[in-house]
Amino acid sequence: PPTGWYLPEVAARRSELDSFDVVEGLVIEGGTAVEVLNAVSMHGGLIASWPDRTIFADTVVQALIEHWRSFGLPAYAQFDNDTRFQGAHQFRDTIGRVVRLCLSLGVTPVFAPPRETGFQAAVESFNARWQAKVWQRFHFDSLADVQAQSAKYALAHRQRARLRIDAAPRRRQFPSSWKLDLQAQPRGCIIYLRRTDARGRVSLLGHSFVVDRTWPHRLVRAHVDLIAEQIKFFALRRREPNWHRLLNTVAYHLPKRKFIDVRKSSNN
């Protein structure tokens, strides 16, 4: 199927999508652990990397703000289902800080289906490339050395890919007066790519929803519309990438409650 086939606006090259992922398990000689947040845009191939000792949800938020201030806002930001991106999994109706950031900037968060291949292929390929071109090519004595070499690589890569980046779908300008308010009630749309179970149901936001009993073990795209207070489920088929039939619409209301920083509260 074409690039971004599961999102019609991306597949038609009308919209850009940034994919994010974390590389874990790296250790500098001497014992310093390193994790890397990586980003790549689907059409432009615009890359960025943020090596750190540990990647927290707040690390991701600050990196996205920095990246989008510099290069503009995509229409979509795609992640896997790691709690750093999605928010805590143990509570119902949890909207994490990264999702709140995206929604506040008019960027639609997209979550890849668990245990499915292909959806994060671009950023996973970049993960491997970063390790080959940066991590495995040089000897590092400190995290600062890793960060400096990674920044050099990203800059050189963006210069080489300039024509492709310029030809990609337009990115919106970052709003000058914007300020992140984690306590604001989230508004906008969140997209979850999921596979139904044997009964045609999917689990989202701590709830189980009937999609279509005639659509078992199949891929769907769930649009959680927080303004319309509904979820629309669309059928997805790799063999028919332009076919996105609406399967079901269900009511959904996100409760209004205070955003709690789980990491900070657990450290108190």
Describe the function of each predicted region.
Residues 1-17, 170-175:
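Basic, flexible linker segments flanking DNA-binding modules
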Residues 16-47, 57-59:
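An active-site-proximal beta-strand-loop segment
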Residues 30-31, 81, 206, 237:
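Residue-level detection of beta-strand-connecting loop/turn positions
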Residues 32, 49-76, 251-254:
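Active-site beta-loop-alpha junctions of metal-dependent nucleic acid enzymes
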Residues 58-62, 122, 241-248:
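A short, polar/proline- and glycine-enriched secondary-structure boundary/capping micro-motif
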Residues 77-80, 88-132, 143-147, 151:
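RNase H-like two-metal-ion nuclease catalytic core shared by retroviral integrases
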Residues 154-268:
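C-terminal, beta-rich DNA-binding module of retroviral/retroelements integrases
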